[in-house]
Amino acid sequence: MPELPEVETTKQGIKPHLEGRIITTAQVRNRKLRLPVPLNLNELCEGKHITAITRRGKYILLHMDKGYILIHLGMSGHLRIVSQTANPQKHDHVDLHINNGLALRFCDPRRFGLFIYIDENPYQHPLLAHLGPEPLSDDFNSEYLLRKAANKSQSIKSFIMDSQIVVGIGNIYAAESLFLAKIHPNTSAKKITTEEFNSLTGHIKKILESAIEAGGTTLRDFYSSDGKPGYFRFALKVYGRKNLPCLVCENKIETVVIAGRHSAFCPHCQPIIT
């Protein structure tokens, strides 16, 4: 699933082509996504100015002079900027034609994404209203996490992947951040010390910033708006490296299932706290 760096990379890629432009046509080929694409999307969007493009967590918002389009890439989706004459492929579900001869094309093979219209304040929409702070903001710090973790017996990995605690951190970047902070992913959140939270928040911020600079992580499905893969996969220390030697201590990387997700870690660098 695209995480914060992949969504931010996508936002940055489409922004120069869309911001300040006018939507001339909205073309829907398949409405059946996680939430159905509005039947009247063309009526809602035609002639609207795109005034801004922002990101909230793993969501992209197209701000128009009236209304908003909320986009989520789901498990395998991506947005591309293409010529309006480019032939659509099998999983290209929605096109927004722009008054510069280009189109924003939404592709989602597994159809877990969404492409919906919101009339009112989008930040009050149920999908956004209860999200936690952005991990790259000043609001996300060790004091905040320490306060939220009080009496939380869930694993620290599940804790930082909870979008109501902090947005945008998925399996890849949670595993990498915990490795650098030397915290076992199954450690109870309430047992993490202030010093450890200081280390963890710092590493989360650094990893996300580095991943954004590298264009995100491409393992299978993610490509940026210009069709390029993300190169942060070459910097991964533990994710996807089961049974390979740790790059720090040379012990074998192991995995443990936490909340249904395989979590990679080094048993030597990240000892479990009992």
From Swiss-Prot:
Mention one GO molecular function: zinc ion binding
Q: Which domain of life is it from?
A: Bacteria
ZnF FPG-type: positions: 237-271
What the record notes about the co-factor is: Binds 1 zinc ion per subunit.
Q: Please list the residues that make up the active site.
A: 2 (schiff-base intermediate with dna), 3 (proton donor), 58 (proton donor), 261 (proton donor)
Q: Where, in this chain's numbering, is DNA bound?
A: 91, 110, 152
Enumerate the NCBIfam families for this protein. Answer: fpg, PRK01103.1
Say what the protein does: Involved in base excision repair of DNA damaged by oxidation or by mutagenic agents. Acts as a DNA glycosylase that recognizes and removes damaged bases. Has a preference for oxidized purines, such as 7,8-dihydro-8-oxoguanine (8-oxoG). Has AP (apurinic/apyrimidinic) lyase activity and introduces nicks in the DNA strand. Cleaves the DNA backbone by beta-delta elimination to generate a single-strand break at the site of the removed base with both 3'- and 5'-phosphates.
Q: What is this protein called?
A: Formamidopyrimidine-DNA glycosylase
Q: Which organism is it from?
A: Legionella pneumophila (strain Paris)
